[in-house]
């Protein structure tokens, strides 16, 4: 499916893949590492464990091996990517990959006033560009991460009203 999106990139533009399939062991390591960062970044220290887990799940999947609900990256159905322009530089998407802030939400720049702010408009347009390329190719987007797209996994299946292709 990614080749379909790549075919629609303008001449000289390329996808840069940061992450795709990952084993459960790596998913567990990332979950542990990122959980504490997310708690600090979003000031979740005073929430219950259950409330913290709910917020953390917006950014990284719990690595519990579950054949019915495996984390997207462990199925091979998820990809984290960006776009490189013909000048060899990444397009500006407003945050780094795997940043944990409100600005990482795919629609963040759709929800703020960007009039008169050329940088914010550029970021919004770059996110729209990536989003439309991937959605037109059949992917789904994880709303909390502008760089994360899925095809064939449980989240994609829920959105598409289909059965998951990858488990």
Model segments located where?
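Cell-envelope/glycan interface and biosynthesis
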Residues: 1-167
């Amino acid at each position: 499916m990614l080749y379909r999106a790549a075919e629609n990139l303008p001449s000289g533009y390329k996808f840069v893949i940061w992450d795709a399939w990952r084993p459960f062991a790596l998913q567990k390591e990332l979950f542990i590492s990122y959980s504490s960062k997310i708690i600090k970044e979003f000031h979740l220290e005073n929430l219950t464990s259950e409330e913290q887990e709910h917020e953390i799940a917006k950014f990284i999947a719990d690595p519990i091996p579950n054949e019915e609900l495996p984390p997207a990256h462990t199925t091979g159905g998820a990809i984290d990517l960006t776009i490189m322009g013909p000048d060899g530089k990444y397009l500006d998407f407003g945050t780094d990959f795997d940043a944990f802030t409100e600005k990482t939400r795919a629609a963040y720049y759709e929800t703020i006033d960007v009039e008169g702010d050329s940088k914010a408009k550029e970021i919004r347009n770059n996110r729209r560009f990536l989003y439309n390329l991937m959605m037109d190719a059949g992917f789904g987007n994880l709303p909390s991460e502008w760089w994360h797209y899925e095809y064939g996994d449980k989240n994609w299946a829920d959105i598409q009203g289909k059965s998951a292709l990858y488990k």
